[in-house]
From Swiss-Prot:
Protein name per its UniProtKB record: Very-long-chain 3-oxoacyl-CoA reductase
Membrane-spanning segments: 21-41
Organism of provenance: Coprinopsis cinerea (strain Okayama-7 / 130 / ATCC MYA-4618 / FGSC 9003) (Inky cap fungus)
Coiled-coil segments on the chain, per record: none
GO CC entries: endoplasmic reticulum membrane
Chief localization: endoplasmic reticulum
GO biological process, one term: fatty acid elongation
Highest taxon of the lineage: Eukaryota
Length: 339
């Protein structure tokens, strides 16, 4: 006991002997250390321990529908499958009627739910097509909307070298399609006082990506759109999330092999649906209504937040894309010579 009192006296004497600015810096350092500990624990709990909002809140197993765009391949198909498994009827929206029918049949057979399909090419969708989609949606009790359809550049390129039709398609698919489909479904969600809107975003929307400027800009739109819309409809019991995503094995990413940072669609989608309402890795990023739920993506997002030097990541991404473009052009040259 005496030794503890002596230690306390020594500490108090040391503090009294220090100038005021030293005490201030010590207090500031202690505060920052506690803040980082608190934030880290919060991210870990949200990512690995706490459950998200139950899908039953949005009508699972109660006859409600889930609408998924880009629903016949990769992440979109996996969302459709897992939402069907959760007890939602599923409306699949994509380009190819044959793959739509096959995916719908697979969901019906496996999960004994209703399905519907709507074929639309969002890159060239007319007003008549959007009107027809609205008519299909009329009368459906939509509890979940997954704005998954997306398009990136064929390869990294500077804006001056990017084909105009590629830029147009990226904006039409990533921005306009999200706006139009959300606009068609939202009134029903507001009326029913419940709903979940998942906008599948990208790290490219959080960190500007040179040589993918158009794509990066459209994903930044999803982030701000989700933040604004989420605040608007919070009073109506609707959750809007920009799902911040690093790479996932898919045709869009052109990645075929999984790794710690690059999951296949199944575990990625499970993480999204199990963490609804939790920001996970984006908890302290300053991006409201954004979630980074897949565990390795969450840790990466949080680490980038702690570093807090966007210019560093922008330069890294620029150099990475220069290398990717160089390798892609070499591959095209080899293929041309082989013909």
């Amino acid at each position: 006991m005496e030794s503890l009192i002596q230690v306390q006296d020594v500490v108090q004497r040391f503090i009294r002997e220090q100038p005021c600015w030293t005490t201030f810096l010590l207090a500031l350092g202690s505060f920052n250390a506690l803040r980082i500990i608190y934030q880290t624990l919060s991210v870990v709990l949200q990512t690995f321990v706490l459950p998200g909002t139950s899908l039953k809140r949005f009508g699972a197993k109660k006859g409600a529908w889930a609408v998924v765009t880009g629903a016949t391949d990769g992440i979109g198909k996996e969302f459709a499958m897992q939402l069907g498994k959760a007890g939602f009827n599923v409306l699949l929206v994509a380009r190819n009627p044959a793959t739509l029918a096959a995916t719908a049949g697979e969901i019906e057979q496996k999960y004994k739910v209703q399905t519907g399909t709507f074929s639309i090419d969002f890159a060239a969708a007319t007003e008549e097509k959007y009107t027809a989609l609205g008519e299909v949606l009329t009368g459906l009790d939509v509890g979940v909307l997954v704005n998954n359809v997306g398009k990136s550049h064929n390869m990294p390129a500077y804006l001056v070298d990017t084909p105009r039709d590629e830029m147009r398609d990226i904006v039409e698919i990533n921005v306009n399609a999200t706006l139009r489909v959300t606009y068609a479904i939202l009134p029903g969600m507001v009326k029913n006082k419940r709903g979940l809107i998942l906008n599948i975003g990208s790290f490219a929307g959080a960190i500007p990506s040179p040589m993918l400027a158009t794509y990066s800009g459209t994903k930044a739109f999803l982030s701000t759109f989700s933040s604004a819309l989420g605040e608007e409809v919070k009073k109506d019991g609707i959750i809007v999330e920009n799902v911040n995503t690093y790479f996932v094995v898919s045709k869009l990413s052109k990645i075929r092999k999984s790794s710690l940072l690059i999951p296949t669609p199944a575990p990625y989608v499970r993480s999204v649906l199990s963490k609804v309402g939790l920001a996970c890795g984006a908890a302290f990023s300053g991006r409201p209504n954004t979630s980074t739920p897949y565990w390795s993506h969450a840790l990466l997002d949080y680490a980038m937040t702690l570093v807090g030097i966007p210019s560093l990541f922008i330069r890294y991404t620029h150099n990475l894309h220069i290398d990717i473009r160089r390798r892609a052009l070499r591959k095209l040259e080899r293929e041309a010579k082989a013909q």
